[in-house]
Amino acid sequence: MARRPSKEWRERFNALSLKCKQLIHSSITNDFTTTDKAQQSTFYSSSGLMDVRKRLSISESLEVFGSLIDNWDLVQLVGTRAEPFVLNNPASYLLVNQLLALAGQAHSAASMVFLNSLMYDDALDHVNLWPYEVERPIPQITREVLSPPPFSVNSYYLQRDIDVIKAKTKAAVYIENYRAGDVFAKKRSISKGATFEERVYHGAVTMLQRMVKLRGSTIQECFVIAISSYRCSDCVRRMMASESGTGAIHEMDHICIMRSNALRWLQAAFSDFPEFPFLMTRDGVKFASNCGAVSTQVPLLFFQTLEMMVLTMDGTLSSTWEGWVCCEWYDRARVGLFSEMFDRRGVVAHLREAILRQSRLLRYQSRGLHLASVSNFPKRSVSADGLDDRIIEGLQKFNSKVCSFIQSWIFQIDLVDEPARWLAVMIKTFASALLYVMGATSLSLEQSAQGTLGIGDPISFPRQEILLEGEWIAVDWYYPDPDLADMREMGMALVDNASPEYTDWEYGFFNVQTTNSAGNVKEVIEERRKQLVAEFGDQGKLLAKVENTRILDAVQKITSTFQNPQDFCDSADNVRKAGERHQVGRRPRVIQMVGTEGQLSAFVLHNVLRPAYKATRFTTSGKNSGDIRDMNIVLEISGELGYKSSLDVKGMDSSTKPFQTNLSLSCVFHRLRGEVLGYPAFFLGSTSSSKDNYVVTRTRYRDEHGGILVEEEYKLTYPQYVLLLGAIHWTSPTRFTDGYFQEFVMTSRTVFRSGLLNTADQHTFLGVIMYALLEKRLRQRWYGKHGKEMREKIGQRREALEEYEEHVKLLGSVLGDDQVAGAFCQGIVDEEVILRITRDLCDETKFLMERLGYECEPEISEYSAEFLKQKGVLGAPELFPERLLLFSSERGDMAGSLPLDRVKIMLSMTDEKIGRARCPLPYASLMLFTSWVSGTASFSIGEEGRLLYRTGRNWKKVFASKRAASVAWKDQFTSDGVFDVRWNGFGMFYKEWASANTKTILLGCGLLWACSDALGVPFPPLVQKDEILCPGTSVYTIPSNAMTHYLLWATRRDRADAERMWRAVRDDLLRGDNDPLESYIEYVDKMFAEVGVIDIPFSALHIYGVGMGFVAGVMPVPMEVWYDFGLFGKVGGFGTWIAELVFKDIRIDREKYDLPRLSMWKNAANHSLPSEVRRASLYARDTLHEKYGMVVPSAVLVAERPGCKIDQALFEVRRVGMEDVRELEKVLDELTRLNHLERKFTKRLAMGLFIVEKLTERRTGYGPAIASNGWGHIAAPYSFQARLLECLAFPMYNGFNYEAVRERVFVDGKLPGDPKLYLKIGRQALSYSEEAYNLVSASMGLSSRQAADMRDMILEGINGLEEARFALNPRKTFLFDVSRRKGAGFFQTPHRRKTNQAYCEMMGMALLLMEPWKFSSGDWRMSFSHRLRAILGRR
């Protein structure tokens, strides 16, 4: 039992609460009259504290936090999974649930009192556990953060020739440290005529408003989730050492948050604030006016602290190391977190290298995820290549205390494998802020959207030219550089050996269109919006958003500018907009969008290059599984001896110029000549019925000195024609909509467009050419035969390769600007030789990329290989836990959504973090607490019970709904909780209060509502009548029907209850004399007489499934005879299913809108498909209906696909007008309809009606024996992950890859809509016959490869089965084989049908992940009820 929270803590809190209450003012509401009506305005004081709308009053908030302190031992017991959930009376869970949910709605003044009441516990400061625990620094907040300097407009200047404001210093590019209130108080504008100062103030305010965007929880909710879930590093170590897979800790003698150094630093920084000094409004971050001078860095430091606490909880950091990380970050905040981060972080890579070199590491060799050997790796010197000098120099930029501290141990490391790998990951928290890097992207355009030189363009001379629009355009070149000439030959060979992805070019172009933005500029969209609103009213706003999607823009262009070349060229030169990307720890980037005309030319390159590079072994495109299989290449490379090169091309988009694009263009142009391709139609006046689709022009060929060899007539195929027109017009202007210091900024016209359809293809193709050439040269012994004489002159000889190249097997991969290279040296054991060979190879990849004109920054290491943000270190994985943020996001468009969506987005990120965590066990309680804190929705109620909502530009106007909100729903909330909370019988609660003259209703889902088949939050320990039903399920629990099975099993009735219920329903079943049900009823009576006292439903199942299924076709006994659905509902069993009904996205209702204009667009889109494609699809659909009675929905027909993409765009664009308030009204209306849920959800309940029985005992696993050594940072020795990996093994590298196949079929195939619908129809057809399946795939327009892939997906899983749930997130179960094949290794069923077998194996896998300690210990039989078999057997 945890000790009761100390009396001193509560007393300290009480004393601080009194001070807080003395600061409370009431808000002043004045009436003022405008010309038309009287209005009220509320004025807030600039000192003291006030109640605010939609937050609990300050007094009640303090009571909630006081109660939370009184019950903190319970919070910790629930958090460490030591407190059982007693099904009949879950009082402790009920209390913690309510307190956390209310704390999430509390006024932040109470959070400040709570924070200031914490007393630091220094128990971990003095334990001898280097490197995990260290002596921490005492928090000293710098003067510049506590009393920030004033804002200065002199940080910026106006570049008058282009009228753009730029930063004078590096710090001003991002968010500088200054007094935030200074800029909010000034007049600001970027409209025409605004002064320089007004523009600067506008830019500064906008930077601050957008500095943090929330993922799915409010600021207060984030704080509550972080403090309640926090586990100190001592508890984390105990969890990791625990024999229990749940990580339960029963004996706790401390309060974890009092050991957090991150909270201690935050306490010191916030000590003078009466409430959180910033808040989140619809406009973004706003600073409180009653907190004095607040630094702009405060919100950043706040979220950095919360994220740091989560990293300590999962074992990435430790409670004492938090102090040193804070010491450095608070020092950086003196100037600006982000600018200092970029300036100081270079040394961290050297620190990592020093840690690895001085440690006794293990090297894991693997092939295709089969661990072949484990060996010791020798230590290396840190002074041999000057690494020590680089470290000392780099550390000078750090805070002086941190610098001295790191220097005191960095050169005396002598660690074994596990702590060394931990330290190497932990040290990275000094490199990257745990935040999305925000700021005005227009100030950092130089890094992302203006041209960079690379290392200059190589020389080339025209080889072939085409006459177009009166000018000769080169389409092929001579390269005097022999390396480049060889690369051109290699590129030509690659495209010649591959067929274009789409042979019908027009259909192919149409098929790759998405629902993303079309790239039109603001005034074009605004003009269309005005026209459509004038014509259609409120729905015009919706149509304007839909019209600006790529798919609809393409429909309109096909009937307009694509009709003739002149219109096409004119439109291609129109200005387009640019978007932006923000990432963790990286500079903001501009994404330059391209018009649909530009995308047409880009599609030509995409259609030819993509199949060419995918045919090589050097790309991973289309092979992504989301799990450890994606890391195979870096694990293989890093596990080999020698150097590895992780090559990052510096600014690949911005340094890609015509030279680089010409290389790929010449290969594609050559492949598209008429004698090879034929003459297909491709817009611009060509017709699909004609065989003569070509443009007659002239071509001439030159020799290497420029002399013309021959000039002749040339027939340009239409793909070639479109390609060349695009090449002429590819530098159309792009406008970056800034909105900070000016309306927009023009970006460079010389930069390669990052928004082009073929951006990734262009970069990947060049990388693949280079690797393919390198492999070919090694195979042909080129370095020994030609390298010496050719490279001698330029000092680039590869002497080791000249001698040993026949022994070298190149290992490498390319995707976009990311490359990795290494080698396997066959038959060579001398380490010095291997180091020389691999060094040559790393230098050669850099040299060849530089020949292409790119500047490269390779990270060459003996230890690490990195690719696509995944790193292998000596053959074991090192993931990037610090790059995943739980509380903030790039866009922030989910915060403020309804509970189900908010919780889903938070849990989705938690799943990702679980897959990268060193100790994932604490995430089980974090998920439960998140479901309680964020599973809420609050509504403001105005006069006459009308819902209040904000609308208008910048959300400035508050409106009331037209009708009073429903109150009938309140009648069902009859059970009392704490603080006037009321509960209904379905695990939902509500609370009503008035604050700041506004009434608020809080609705929440509680208890086990998220432990469901849709959300998959792990069960806590379940206890029923002193029987432990389950010790809690593992953190790897996935959303599946097995969760319904668990809850049904937990709420089953005992014999006496079941018999009583049976007596109540049996008389209703009889319908007069000679009723066939008589014998059935006799049978049930007999069963009650014979069967034992317990496990009624499961015994019933054995006796031919009477209780839960059919007997000779008669109706089954209602399930409520066997299960207590009152209890099932009370503990939240229906919670998620209710949330899906009640909190439904209003955008789904758009399908009911009558929009003739949209129908016209859809019709035009559908008819732009090739007529033979439409005819084949509709013929297959009709044949299926006639022959098999199957109805194929229009949503999956290829004949209707373009229209379906427009429908998809309709559902995806943001809410408009009244949709927000209608969504809220609908919630309250739906609540009134909650009754007889067990009947409403009969099928979904029936999916859990199965039993499992142990057949035999065994203790053998399928995986490698890694528990004793561990495997990299992610699976420490004897950890839960290591044991689970021994049990389940890695996924089969060459086995069925569900995610990769899904990506091929649905993502690459550009199939719109829900994949489940396609699988459901496919499964239905397969159950009839092979012919039916072929007809379905024809109606869907699937290629033979896609049809085969979809068949594999159907046979592999249960997708497409009605009500079946098995939502696997491969990033959560990153290491493990969780395929149905593995389920078959432990589970079998007597039911022989294929769907039954599949369901058994999938549920078996789900059970294995829920309780691996139980289900991996033997072989099991799974039996289904008749009711379940009936559902599985339906077509």
From Swiss-Prot:
Keyword Nucleotide-binding appears in the UniProt entry: yes
Protein name: RNA-directed RNA polymerase VP1
Subunit structure: Interacts with VP4.
Biological process, per Gene Ontology: viral genome replication
Keyword terms, alphabetized: Hydrolase, Nucleotide-binding, Nucleotidyltransferase, RNA-directed RNA polymerase, Transferase, Viral RNA replication
InterPro entries for the chain: RNA-dir_pol_reovirus (IPR007097)
Pfam family of the protein (one): CPV_RdRP_pol_dom
EC number(s) from the headed UniProt entry: 2.7.7.48
Residue stretches making up the RdRp catalytic domain: 604-880
Function: RNA-directed RNA polymerase involved in transcription and genome replication. Following infection, catalyzes the synthesis of fully conservative plus strands. After core assembly, which consists in recruitment of one capped plus-strand for each genomic segments and polymerase complexes, the polymerase switches mode and catalyzes the synthesis of complementary minus-strands.
Similarity-based family: Belongs to the reoviridae RNA-directed RNA polymerase family.
